[in-house]
Amino acid sequence: MSKPDLASLEKTIEKAFDERDAISTATRGETRDAIQAALDLLDRGTVRVAERQADGKWHVNQWLKKAVLLSFRLNPMEIIKGGPGQAVWWDKVPSKFDGWSAVDFEKAGFRAVPSSIVRRSAYVAPGAVLMPSFVNVGAYVDTGTMVDTWASVGSCAQIGKNVHLSGGVGIGGVLEPMQAGPTIIEDNCFIGARSEVVEGCIVREGSVLGMGVFIGQSTKIVDRATGEIFYGEVPPNSVVVAGSLPGKPFPNNEPGPGLYCAVIVKRVDAKTRSKTSINELLRD
């Protein structure tokens, strides 16, 4: 799609969002067509909710996020097929795989294990592997990434190349509660089991999060070597584990409760990389 077409879509969707109270399942014409076109572009990976710029900053295409939100007003509840034992669900968003044949999967080039769920408008790149997991609307999962068992990729989240999201990992979405920007995991990161990254935080390229690390916008991320404190962003090539900071003392001067923090214990080295590198045998 040419840039003028995208500009036209953006203009239509911005106008529709300003008048969102008037949008319903009965809405037809230019508004419905524009929202559906935006979702189709997201689904194919032609556009994405956020894009990394040459200077390393991420640009958020807010109009695409708005298109995802508006689609919930347009679509009626309906039967969603594909449950275990021919069970069904009741929802507004169909599966990305609805109507797919073997030819469609071969063309898409990723592997989707039984019980993996991907909602329409999410993009999964060739070479990715989806274990029984959940990928929500508007998300982007890049090539070579594994989304391991019971991991979830939230709405509009951006997952880079050759990332490993371990079992039970949660990557937060943007739709509820509303966030200005999506949660982002950059290329070549390893996110340890049961960790959570939410609220539009960014884990920069090559970083490793140990098991059970929780990072939101208010989480202190402490560099053990320098004492520097980061918020909302893990620096590149960081090895991060769960930790705590001493709390304020009580009025009687007894120690108060410690507070959770994430601790950068070192930068990624060859030893760390050997323990967290992806296995190409699983991506053939």
Swiss-Prot record:
GO BP, sorted A to Z:
diaminopimelate biosynthetic process; lysine biosynthetic process via diaminopimelate
Q: Which GO terms describe its cellular component?
A: cytoplasm
Indicate which residues the UniProt annotation says bind substrate: 111, 148
| Pfam families per UniProt | Hexapep_2, THDPS_N_2
> Pathway it belongs to?
Amino-acid biosynthesis; L-lysine biosynthesis via DAP pathway; LL-2,6-diaminopimelate from (S)-tetrahydrodipicolinate (succinylase route): step 1/3
In its keyword annotation, does this UniProt entry include Flavoprotein?
Answer: no
Can the keyword Protein biosynthesis be found in this entry's annotation?
no
Give its localization.
Cytoplasm
**Which terms in the Gene Ontology molecular function aspect does this entry carry?**
2,3,4,5-tetrahydropyridine-2,6-dicarboxylate N-succinyltransferase activity; nucleotidyltransferase activity
What reactions does this protein catalyze?
(S)-2,3,4,5-tetrahydrodipicolinate + succinyl-CoA + H2O = (S)-2-succinylamino-6-oxoheptanedioate + CoA
Enzyme Commission number(s):
2.3.1.117
Gene3D superfamilies, A to Z: Hexapeptide repeat proteins, Tetrahydrodipicolinate-N-succinyltransferase, N-terminal domain
Keywords on record: Acyltransferase, Amino-acid biosynthesis, Cytoplasm, Diaminopimelate biosynthesis, Lysine biosynthesis, Repeat, Transferase
The top EC class is transferase
Query: Which segments does the entry list as coiled coil?
Result: none
Primary localization class, coarse: cytoplasm
Its subunit composition reads: Homotrimer.
Matching entries from NCBIfam families are given as: dapD, PRK11830.1
The family annotation for this protein states:
Belongs to the transferase hexapeptide repeat family.
The protein here is known as 2,3,4,5-tetrahydropyridine-2,6-dicarboxylate N-succinyltransferase
Source organism of the structure: Mesorhizobium japonicum (strain LMG 29417 / CECT 9101 / MAFF 303099)
Q: Which gene encodes it?
A: dapD
